[in-house]
Curated annotation (Swiss-Prot):
One GO CC term, this protein: cytosol
Residues involved in ATP binding: 10-17
Annotated EC: 2.7.4.9
Function comment: Phosphorylation of dTMP to form dTDP in both de novo and salvage pathways of dTTP synthesis.
Family: Belongs to the thymidylate kinase family.
Tagged with keyword Transferase: yes
Classification via InterPro entries: P-loop_NTPase, Thymidylate_kin-like_dom, Thymidylate_kin_CS, Thymidylate_kinase
Protein name (Swiss-Prot/TrEMBL): Thymidylate kinase
Gene: tmk
Family matches, as HAMAP family: Thymidylate_kinase
Gene Ontology terms describing biological process: dTDP biosynthetic process; dTTP biosynthetic process; dUDP biosynthetic process
Native source species: Bifidobacterium longum (strain DJO10A)
Annotated transmembrane regions: none
Listed GO MF terms: ATP binding; dTMP kinase activity
Length: 206
């Protein structure tokens, strides 16, 4: 049985974690072996990088520069693919990741004003050109999704409404450019309605 690679994308607070777990349970009930992971932080190296990306450097008076941030995301992703994602796919397993390279494109190119070409080139090099078979973009107005957050804001979440709005639009632009890979789902619906859309689609892949 061939491996299957699925990613979930969207601004913070849209319900990705909930739907990742629903999909895991569904696929395991179908007899598939499922690996659930996330970016940043899907490996030991990634966890250390995640702390830097989300909370900054202890004692650092200056925020992480956009190019440095892009390289940190790429380092996390390169290790993630080499250590976790590609080996699981080669074993014929399903990999579900909460964020992948599209988050870099949306948050860094859309939100941080680096060019999409720069970020995509770096990400594709880091992953050795590995793209998901399916990407579910859970879409919602950031003003609504922000109210759903149940934890203290991290560095990305506190970047402001303009940043979040640019990021949302960047995600939608990515989905429009790759309609065969993306499925855009209205995340303002109920959890059950969002899951129903995912379940209907995944049956064609799994």
């Amino acid at each position: 049985m061939s491996g299957l690679f699925v990613s979930f994308e969207g601004v913070d607070g849209v319900g990705k974690t909930t739907q990742v777990e629903r999909l895991r349970a569904y696929l395991e009930a179908q007899g598939r072996t499922v690996v659930v992971t996330r970016e940043p932080g899907g490996t030991a190296l990634g966890k250390a990088i995640r702390q830097l990306l989300l909370h900054g450097v202890d004692g650092g008076a200056v925020d992480i520069a956009p190019r440095a941030e892009a390289l940190l995301f790429a380092a996390d992703r390169a290790q993630h693919v080499a250590e976790t994602i590609r080996p699981a796919l080669e074993r014929g397993e399903v990999v579900i990741t909460d964020r992948y390279l599209d988050s870099s494109l949306a948050y860094q190119a859309g939100g941080r004003e680096l060019t999409p070409e720069e970020i995509r080139s770096l990400s594709m090099w880091a992953t050795n050109n590995l793209l998901p078979d399916r990407t579910y973009l859970l879409d919602m107005d950031p003003a609504l999704s922000h109210n759903r957050l149940e934890h203290a804001e991290d560095r990305m979440e506190s970047a402001g409404s303009d940043f979040q709005s640019r990021t949302r639009q960047a995600f939608l632009d990515l989905a429009a450019a790759e309609p065969n890979r993306f499925r855009v789902i209205d995340a303002s619906q109920s959890i059950e309605a969002v899951w129903a859309a995912i379940e209907s689609d995944i049956k064609e892949l799994a």
